[in-house]
Amino acid sequence: MRVTKIATAKPFVGAPKINLAAIVGAAPNKPFLLRIPVTGERPITCRASGLPKGVTLDGQILSGVFSEAGELDVTLTVENAKGRCERTVRFEIGEGKLLPTPLLGFTTWNAFGSDVTQKDVTQTAKRLVELGITEYGYGYVNTDSGWQGVYGGAHDAVMPNAKFPDMKAMTDAIHALGLRAGIYSTPMLTAWGCPKEFSSIPGCTVGEPDPRFTDTNGGIGMIHKEANNVAQWTDWGFDYLKYDWRPTDTVNAELMRAELAKSSREFAYCVTVDALPQYHAYWSRFVNSYRCNWDALGYWSNLLLVYESYFRFMEYNCKGHFFDLDMLDTGTCRCAAVKNELTEDEMILAYTMRALLNSPIQISSSLEKLDDFELSLYCNDEIIAINQDTAFSLSLPILRGRGVDVFEKRLADGSYAYAYFCIGDETVETVAELEGTATVRDVWAKEDLAETATLSLTLAPHTARVVRCTSRIKSVIQK
């Protein structure tokens, strides 16, 4: 039985609320697309004032081209029968400005594995909208490995296999919903995630292995096809690349980044799976997110390994560049055909660590089996707002105790978010002294706890709590 109380998500009930970060980034002179996330009763009307020439709002979807670099404030107004909401958003237009806050979206790997099909991707995109998940800011639908066939086509690039008959039609369908589309590749000669009907699938290099790099999956080829593949992804209409190899070196990362920058489309760029901290200066400047951890596999000991990976990178997170704790390992995964081994409390902890530790959040479960708990797990606007907060503060531990860790994150409104992780196997009691009397809110439950200068919390094993305080904690102890 679940211990942690969480509020029930009701994306299409009540007055409207805009769930968009206070800062949005985009490149000049490249196509821009954004679905304005709005919860509340339907129908709704949306208006925007302050948009430049070339960018328009159609329903909830902003699209067009920003012709000049710079900053501008756009006021968004939404109304329904229950009320009205207005929010001013800062648009920062320039090279490298995309995704100032962590990416929110869906990725196919845990949900479908290498069996993924074009139909799976397009149906998932529609389901994200129908369920209301997109109204909390999830804006990317990313296809992981399993789409690849052989080299060919107009650009001599990797072509899709028969499971993906029309990549352009797929991205068009995703874009029509106001969402962005992602793709997967690797600099290795052979990609991970090969579908069972193939013996291997190619990456972005060919030829003999380059002796400068390790021989993982055949190594990295001497002949580089990054430009070919980026040209093909551009023609298809993709907006995001997951680039996956081990060890994740900056030479190959930069070769791909440079080609993405030349594209007529703007690409978010994620590198995995062994982006070592010794290269943090590069990751923190040139990639939107980077991983150096195990794949999230949906059981407790694996979750702890992913969690522990954060501590080597926690001081390097910065605006636009975030350490990635991998896709969510929650819900039902079709590739395993069963629900994962995590309890509901452990799933809450898994989500909390991504949200509060400034990681991208990518859902990766089979949405046709989504239940009320899972929807509420993914769709807590107050938890997501902490992840998307534009103070861009680090989330750092103020207590590493016996089976319990407490993290602090300063927020843009001057309040503080605290995440408590009980990772041990025993119940833990904590007492925190605040700098003054404060309003304390249980963020998962969406309930105010008290006006207090002392916060006492009891945490059951394998649980997480998130509180938001109007005053800072000056000390916290484990009893």
Each model region followed by its residue ranges:
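Proline/serine/threonine-rich low-complexity linkers at boundaries of modular beta-sandwich domains
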Residues: 4-16
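Solvent-exposed, low-complexity, repeat-rich "mucin-like" stalks and linkers
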Residues: 15-43
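Surface-exposed or secretory-pathway low-complexity segments enriched in glycine-proline
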Residues: 39-60, 87
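Extracellular/luminal low-complexity segments enriched in Ser/Thr/Pro
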Residues: 60-69
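Aromatic-lined carbohydrate-binding/catalytic grooves of carbohydrate-active enzymes
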Residues: 122-250
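Glycan-recognition surfaces
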Residues: 206-212, 216-218, 251, 262, ...
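Carbohydrate-binding surface patches
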Residues: 348, 354-357, 362-364, 400-435, ...
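C-terminal beta-strand-rich structural cap/linker in extracellular carbohydrate-active enzymes
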Residues: 451-479
